[in-house]
């Protein structure tokens, strides 16, 4: 199933940007996923193509207008009535591997990128938007966050990453833990050596070492992820 992604933005020239490179870009060229970028400004009715205005009640900055954004959303819905609506927002649910995986099951998603001080709340009240955040910090707009979301989803689609084992072994996928350390040639570099176990050829012991390292790193750096794991098998 092809994933079709619609992006609503006032800066359409930002796309595909980084999404045109590496495995994500190759998947785009192969049609494994499609990108449709919609310029919100093109739906403004005045000669200046105004997309923002001062907030009611006062306050700093400008707010993106509901009538303009609504027209852009209606255009998308007229062609894809079942599209999954997503708004990139610091108030949203924090993006994780599970959410990325769930979104790949949709054939069509639409991502709204805000700017300025945000969008008129009535957009979220009128439409069925799912708000997603990529972290507890603020960006100047939703476009970069949107790219993070798209890449996190697309790389999970079968056929995008050639070695599917890479996805199975990486952080947050295997038992919801952080990934174990990785090494490659040379075996010795500036006085630092690759752990002997990785050079032993004993795959049973190597796999146990990887599991142990993954658990220990997760316990140290993200202890909340290990709450449901029986650590006795790793220690």
From Swiss-Prot:
The keyword Transferase applies. InterPro entries: Alpha/beta_knot_MTases, tRNA_m1G_MeTrfase_C_sf, tRNA_m1G_MeTrfase_TrmD, tRNA_m1G_MTases_N, tRNA_MeTrfase_TRMD/TRM10. Keywords: Cytoplasm, Methyltransferase, S-adenosyl-L-methionine, Transferase, tRNA processing. It catalyses: guanosine(37) in tRNA + S-adenosyl-L-methionine = N(1)-methylguanosine(37) in tRNA + S-adenosyl-L-homocysteine + H(+). It comes from the Bacteria. GO terms for molecular function: tRNA (guanine(37)-N1)-methyltransferase activity. GO terms for cellular component: cytosol. Its EC number is 2.1.1.228. It is found in: Cytoplasm. S-adenosyl-L-methionine binds at residues 114, 134-139. One of its GO terms (biological process) is tRNA N1-guanine methylation. It holds the Pfam family tRNA_m1G_MT. CDD domains: TrmD-like (cd18080). Belongs to the RNA methyltransferase TrmD family. Homodimer. NCBIfam families: PRK00026.1 (NF000648), trmD (TIGR00088). Specifically methylates guanosine-37 in various tRNAs. This is tRNA (guanine-N(1)-)-methyltransferase. It comes from Ehrlichia canis (strain Jake).
């Amino acid at each position: 199933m092809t994933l079709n992604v619609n992006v609503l933005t006032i800066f359409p020239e930002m796309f595909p940007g980084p999404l045109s490179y590496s495995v994500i870009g190759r998947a785009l060229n192969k049609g494994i996923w499609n990108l449709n970028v919609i310029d919100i400004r093109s739906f403004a009715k005045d000669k200046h193509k105004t997309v923002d205005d001062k907030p009611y009640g006062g306050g700093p900055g400008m707010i993106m207008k509901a009538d303009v954004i609504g027209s852009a959303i209606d255009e998308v819905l007229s062609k894809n009535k079942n599209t999954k609506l997503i708004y990139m927002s610091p108030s949203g649910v924090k993006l994780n591997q599970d959410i990325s995986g769930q979104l790949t099951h949709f054939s069509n998603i639409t991502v709204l990128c805000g700017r300025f001080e945000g969008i008129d709340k009535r957009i979220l009240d009128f439409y069925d938007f799912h708000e997603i955040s990529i972290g507890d910090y603020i960006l100047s707009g939703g476009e970069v966050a949107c790219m993070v979301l798209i890449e996190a989803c697309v790389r999970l689609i079968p056929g995008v990453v050639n070695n599917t084992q890479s996805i199975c072994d990486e952080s947050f996928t295997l038992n919801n833990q952080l990934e174990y350390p990785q090494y490659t040639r040379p075996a010795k570099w500036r006085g630092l050596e690759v752990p002997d176990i990785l050079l032993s050829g004993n795959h049973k012991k190597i796999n146990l070492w990887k599991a142990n390292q993954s658990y220990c790193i997760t316990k140290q750096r993200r202890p909340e992820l290990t709450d449901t794991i029986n650590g006795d098998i790793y220690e």
